[in-house]
Amino acid sequence: MAELSTVARPYAEALFSAARDDKAGLPAWADLIGELAQVAGNPDVREAMTDPRLGDAQRIELFTGLVKTQLPQAVRNFIELLVANDRLLLLPVIAKQFVALKNRHEGTAQAEITSAFELSDAQVKELIEALETKFGLKLKPSVTVDKSLIGGVRVAVGDQVLDTSVQAQLARLRDTLAA
């Protein structure tokens, strides 16, 4: 995976640079890149894009035809570049890096919150306020429920994980007793 990230990085940085200078703005570009990544991540599309019988022009037309949003010329050029360099299937990785660059630029981060139970809006707000103080960033929450946690929450912000779930506490206790 590290190799894919390394190959995708220059494309994500170039795309971010173009998006930052565009009047449509970073959020519009992030949505569009997310859609492109979703199309590129489809198994049928991946299979078609690796078909040796298709030329570059056919791949470009096929791929752009599957995208619902009208593509600006800069994005069409980007897709042509990816196809010419056999990098179109890296779009999901490029999109992830683009969002990371966008978040860093905006001073924000995605907070993946996993809870054992459904959290109310007030609970999410209170948790995010505490986490924003801890991480020093404006956080965008994404909440999922995983009953296997038994209780508590697990929060991932970037590469940092804060796990206060009962499941994690039991695992630590088990490891301590086994040692």
From Swiss-Prot:
The keyword Transport applies. Transmembrane segments: none annotated. SUPFAM superfamilies: N-terminal domain of the delta subunit of the F1F0-ATP synthase (SSF47928). Pfam families: OSCP (PF00213). GO terms for cellular component: plasma membrane; proton-transporting ATP synthase complex. Disulfide bonds: none annotated. InterPro entries: ATP_synth_OSCP/delta_N_sf, ATPase_OSCP/dsu. GO terms for molecular function: proton-transporting ATP synthase activity, rotational mechanism. F(1)F(0) ATP synthase produces ATP from ADP in the presence of a proton or sodium gradient. F-type ATPases consist of two structural domains, F(1) containing the extramembraneous catalytic core and F(0) containing the membrane proton channel, linked together by a central stalk and a peripheral stalk. During catalysis, ATP synthesis in the catalytic domain of F(1) is coupled via a rotary mechanism of the central stalk subunits to proton translocation. This protein is part of the stalk that links CF(0) to CF(1). It either transmits conformational changes from CF(0) to CF(1) or is implicated in proton conduction. Belongs to the ATPase delta chain family. F-type ATPases have 2 components, F(1) - the catalytic core - and F(0) - the membrane proton channel. F(1) has five subunits: alpha(3), beta(3), gamma(1), delta(1), epsilon(1). F(0) has three main subunits: a(1), b(2) and c(10-14). The alpha and beta chains form an alternating ring which encloses part of the gamma chain. F(1) is attached to F(0) by a central stalk formed by the gamma and epsilon chains, while a peripheral stalk is formed by the delta and b chains. This is ATP synthase subunit delta. It comes from Bordetella petrii (strain ATCC BAA-461 / DSM 12804 / CCUG 43448). The lineage of its organism: Bacteria, Pseudomonadati, Pseudomonadota, Betaproteobacteria, Burkholderiales. The gene is atpH.
